[in-house]
Amino acid sequence: MSSGQGYVASGRPLLFDVVSVQSQVVYGHVGNNVAAPALRAHGLHPGIVPTVLLSNTPHYPTLHGGALPLSWFEGYLQDLQARGALQALRAILVGYLGSAEQARVLGRWIARIREVHPQVLVIVDPVMGDDDHGLYVTEGLAEASRECLVPQAHGLTPNSFELGLLTGCEVGRVDQAVAAARRLLAQGLRWVVVTSAAQQDCPPGQVQLLAVTASQAHLLRHQRVDTAPKGTGDLFCAELTAHLLAGASLERAVEASSRYLVQALACTRLADSAELLMPSRDPAQAQAVQWIPLEN
């Protein structure tokens, strides 16, 4: 591909509402492969920045690819600004990263963007591990995410394992998870939404999400769907971003995102699909969820 030297673009730049920084695969529905279509389904125009480029997710028997070279990754971010694509930017969505160096570069870039566009919403899904598999990124990346990305975020969507990792707290019960989330709020976050939350207090056959702000905490429950495709957190976070940008409150955004995610899981299970499916957004197919206000 040509370097572009000697070429001067004419006309108005292509403007992005959201910059989504996360993984990309050739086969599968994870990372930007689900975030981009989810955001577009809400009428948004995402700029897609890959952190890793893989043939598929690592749970398959073969895997090719890896993290993008740091110079490429940094160049992608710089060139979005250089092309004038961020003049109407409304949100930055961060998911899976490929290295600690990427986290540091991204943290500095977000800080510069926030200086120019202070209204931009920054949502970080700190993809680092889960209760079933433990930590599946390097300890260096986990530390860099904690130091460089959490301070830049307005909202965070860790799972229960990641909440414990970020805070060093016990998070198995609802009261413990709320206290841990509020420790993160003390770092400048507006809210924390914990997925697969407080599993010691979760009724059988249910899944819990916990939405925590400085003044309120709410627990959301829905039926567990008997399927476990990859990419559910990526889809939830993209949906959450879209609903917040549409003006929904945090509680309503979490509720709508959860309803669609359960619908997607039910569709995936019905089709016996190895990968997460994204059905059309049919209100008639919306799944039941239950909100439980907690004492503050």
UniProtKB/Swiss-Prot annotation:
Its cofactor is Mg(2+). GO terms for molecular function: ATP binding; hydroxymethylpyrimidine kinase activity; magnesium ion binding; pyridoxal kinase activity; zinc ion binding. InterPro entries: PdxK (IPR023479), PM/HMP-P_kinase-1 (IPR013749), PyrdxlKinase (IPR004625), Ribokinase-like (IPR029056). Transmembrane segments: none annotated. It comes from the Bacteria. Coiled coil: none annotated. One of its GO terms (biological process) is pyridoxal 5'-phosphate salvage. Mg(2+) binds at Y136, E162. SUPFAM superfamilies: Ribokinase-like. GO terms for cellular component: cytosol. CDD domains: pyridoxal_pyridoxamine_kinase. The keyword Lyase does not apply. Belongs to the pyridoxine kinase family. PdxK subfamily. This is Pyridoxine/pyridoxal/pyridoxamine kinase. It comes from Bordetella avium (strain 197N).
